[in-house]
C-alpha cells in the first residue's frame, strides 16, 4: 500500500486515502529552514518548567501542553499548504484543539501498545451522554469521546526528524478507523497488515484519531532523535453543551 502523496491543486487522492486507509503522508510541508526554525522554537519553549513537560533522567520526551508553551505552533495547520485540504475535510471554522510534542531521545526511547486516540481535552468535566472516563492530565481535564465525534476529527503529526526503523517509527493498521467500535481487533492484528511510517523531516502524517497505531522502540545505540509535533483538529460547534474545548484556536 502506498500512503505517500502530495498535491497542491487537487486533493482527490488524499481524500480517497483518508477515507480508505485513515491516513496519508503529505511530503515536504516544511523545508529544511522551516524545520530548523521549529526545532529552535520548541527548544526555547521547553526551557520552561511547565507541568505538562514529560522528562526522564533529565531528557525531555514529551509535552502535553504544547499550545500553552508554544501558542504559535497552530500556524503549522493554519498557514501552510495543507490548509486547503483541512478546510475540505473539516469545513471552514475548524480549530486546533490539542497540541502535543513527542521525542525519543537517544538512550531514552519508549514504546506504546496498540491503541486508538479516544480522549479529548475539555475546559471542564460535565455529565454528557457518551462522554466518559474523566481524567486530569497536566492540569487539563480530559474525557473519552464517543465515536461519532472522533470520526469528525483529524490529527497532524509534523515530523522534525527523519524517521526510519532506527528511531522508533509509528506503525499503523490501515483501514482500522472504519471498525473502531471497540479495540478487540488489536489483539488479533496481522503483522502483514501493519505499516511502519518512515518519512523525512518536514513531512506530515495525516490520520484519523481512530486509526489503530503503536510506536516502536528506537534501536539500541542510535544517536537519532524522533521529534514530532502532534496537532488535533476539530470542526466548529461540534461539542454538545455544556462541554467546551480546553483550547480551540481557529
Role assignments for model-derived ranges:
Residues 25-28, 95-98, 155, 169-172, ...:
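A structural signal for short, well-ordered beta-strand segments and their strand-loop junctions
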Residues 98-100, 156-158, 229-233:
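A structural signal for short, well-ordered beta-strand segments
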Residues 108-198, 240-246:
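Catalytic core of non-heme Fe(II) oxygenases with the double-stranded beta-helix
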Residues 22-23, 202:
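Catalytic palm active-site di-aspartate
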Residues 30-32, 101-104, 119, 162-165, ...:
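Short, solvent-exposed loop/turn segments at secondary-structure junctions
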Residues 1-21, 27-136:
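Non-heme Fe(II)-dependent double-stranded beta-helix
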Residues 48, 170-172, 177-195, 201-206, ...:
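Non-heme Fe(II)/2-oxoglutarate
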Amino acid at each position: 500500500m502506498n500512503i505517500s502523496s502530495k498535491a497542491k491543486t487537487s486533493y482527490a487522492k488524499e481524500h480517497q486515502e483518508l477515507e480508505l486507509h485513515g491516513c496519508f503522508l503529505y511530503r515536504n510541508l516544511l523545508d529544511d529552514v522551516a524545520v530548523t526554525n521549529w526545532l529552535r522554537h520548541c527548544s526555547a519553549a521547553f526551557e520552561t518548567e511547565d507541568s505538562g513537560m514529560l522528562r526522564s533522567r533529565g531528557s525531555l520526551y514529551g509535552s502535553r501542553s504544547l499550545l500553552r508553551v508554544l501558542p504559535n505552533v497552530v500556524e503549522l495547520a493554519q498557514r501552510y499548504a495543507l490548509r486547503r485540504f483541512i478546510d475540505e475535510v473539516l469545513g471552514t471554522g475548524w480549530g486546533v484543539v490539542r497540541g502535543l510534542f513527542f521525542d525519543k531521545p537517544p538512550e531514552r526511547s519508549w514504546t506504546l501498545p496498540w491503541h486508538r486516540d479516544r480522549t479529548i481535552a475539555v475546559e471542564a468535566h460535565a455529565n454528557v451522554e457518551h462522554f466518559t472516563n474523566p481524567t486530569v492530565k497536566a492540569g487539563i481535564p480530559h474525557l473519552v469521546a464517543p465515536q461519532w465525534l472522533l470520526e469528525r476529527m483529524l490529527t497532524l503529526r509534523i515530523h522534525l526528524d527523519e524517521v526510519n526503523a532506527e528511531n522508533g517509527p509509528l506503525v499503523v493498521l490501515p483501514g482500522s478507523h472504519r471498525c473502531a467500535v471497540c479495540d478487540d481487533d488489536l489483539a488479533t492484528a496481522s503483522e502483514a497488515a501493519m505499516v511502519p511510517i518512515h518519512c523525512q523531516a518536514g513531512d506530515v502524517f495525516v490520520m484519523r484519531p481512530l486509526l489503530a497505531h503503536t510506536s516502536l522502540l528506537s534501536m539500541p545505540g542510535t544517536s537519532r532523535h524522533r521529534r514530532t509535533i502532534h496537532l488535533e483538529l476539530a470542526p466548529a460547534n461540534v461539542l454538545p453543551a455544556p462541554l467546551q474545548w480546553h483550547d480551540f484556536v481557529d
